[in-house]
Regions:
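C-terminal nucleotide
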Residues: 2-23, 27-29, 37-105, 118-121, ...
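Short Gly/Ser/Thr- and Asp/Glu-enriched loop/turn motifs at secondary-structure junctions
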Residues: 106-108, 329-334
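Alpha-helical scaffolds flanking conserved acidic
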Residues: 108, 152-156
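N-terminal pre-triad scaffold of radical SAM enzymes
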Residues: 111-125
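DPxDG-like acidic metal-binding loop motif
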Residues: 126-149
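Short glycine/threonine-rich catalytic loop with a Thr-x-Gly-x-Asp
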Residues: 128-130, 324-330
Length: 369
């Protein structure tokens, strides 16, 4: 954070990393069920510059769009329709928290967004969680602008409440990774409880309380277990895949499979959590492979395409070279991941991926906050 002296205006800069799911996909949308999620070394940055006339919202993703906003009392009010609904809601939630903490929110500012998570010039999305990162970075910047103390957990909670107010689906594991950085073990909160609390409690009261079923635990770095990420060139639509799963689940007359899937996924993820803590590489490899097999079984029963032909090739080539691999996130496109214990193996996989038209993304695990 940069504060300019005297009558000079305040400038704040905040960044949030992208994410990749390592294990636990689909099951983690259920409260209390776990996933391993990594923050990765590409970032979305939000800059706030104090102004005295009219506020603006801008982004390198939409360079021709400038949204003006003003105040109604202390409340943020955008002028007209615009593509920044997530950003607007994040500002509203963060500023409500600031006011409930005893501070005023009369200031005007220009908020600008720059992102490394997508390739705006070529119109390419890599599936690195830009929607979660923009909410996290915006909330961090607004809290810093008003000199309101923050923790990673507070930023996570405010970001989740932002998404719930927009009826967003998903586990919010991307938000956990962007808020905490590094690698985390994550179980999702009970969204029904939070939605009920939003009807009759203040934002600050909700954030100050413990959240049912939520757990976020940082996991240690594993220098001898390197993450390698391949991008297939296909774009996955996470929300659509989750909705399809929900519809299928609702019409299932026998939910025994789904219950068993949740049980198996939770056991695999807990095993990975313990293996990360003890740096047990063979157990980590076994867990990644087990999760891949479970997700493929889940996809077959739920009539989903999680592991596309390109993702299957990505995983199989990694496995043929002795690495463990799987899809990352909802599947159906975007990225696959593998973990390699040595440089020779990594180079062999990268070469074979390139021959199969799979692009290696130069990513590493982002620093924990």
């Amino acid at each position: 954070m940069q504060l300019l002296k005297g009558s000079e205006r305040v400038t704040i800069t905040s960044k949030a990393p992208g994410k990749l799911f390592i294990a636990g996909e689909y099951a983690v949308v259920e409260p209390g069920h776990g996933a391993i999620v990594a923050a990765v070394s590409r970032y979305l940055t939000v800059t706030i510059d104090e102004t005295t006339s009219v506020g603006t919202l801008t982004s390198t993703q939409n360079p021709d769009v400038v949204v003006e906003w003003t105040r109604e009392g202390e409340l943020f009010r955008a002028k007209g329709e615009h593509p920044y609904n997530l950003v607007e809601k994040a500002i509203l939630v963060a500023e409500q928290y600031v006011r409930e903490s005893g501070k005023e929110t009369f200031a005007l500012y220009s908020l600008s967004i720059t992102s490394e998570l997508d390739d705006a010039k070529r119109g390419i999305k890599y599936g690195l969680g830009s929607s979660g990162a923009v909410v996290v970075a915006t909330i961090q910047a607004v809290l810093d602008f008003y000199k309101t103390p923050r923790t990673s957990l507070l930023v996570y909670k405010l970001s989740v409440l932002t998404n719930l107010r927009l009826s967003q689906r998903g586990s919010f594991g991307d938000i956990a990774a962007s808020s905490f950085g590094g690698m985390v073990y994550y179980t999702s909160p009970n969204r029904s409880c939070l939605l009920e609390q939003l009807q009759n409690q203040s934002i600050k009261a909700i954030c100050d309380a413990d959240w049912k079923d939520l757990m976020i635990e940082r996991l240690p770095e594993l220098p001898d277990f390197t993450l390698l990420v391949g991008w297939t060139g296909q774009v996955a639509i996470t929300d659509s895949l989750i909705q399809a799963t929900e519809k299928k689940r609702k019409v299932e007359t026998d939910s025994a499979f789904y219950k068993e899937f949740l049980k198996k996924s939770h056991a695999i993820v807990q095993g990975l959590q313990n293996a990360w803590k003890t740096q047990d590489i063979p157990a980590l490899q076994e867990g990644i492979r087990a999760n891949r097999a479970l997700l493929n079984e889940f996809a077959q029963v739920m009539q989903l395409e999680i592991e596309t032909p390109a993702l299957r090739t990505l995983c199989d080539l990694a496995e043929q070279n002795g690495a463990c691999a799987k899809t990352s996130g909802a599947g159906g496109g975007d990225c696959g991941i593998c973990f390699t214990p040595n440089e020779t193996q990594r180079q062999q996989i990268e070469t074979q991926w390139a021959k199969a038209q799979i692009q290696v993304l130069p990513l590493s695990i982002a620093e924990a906050w």
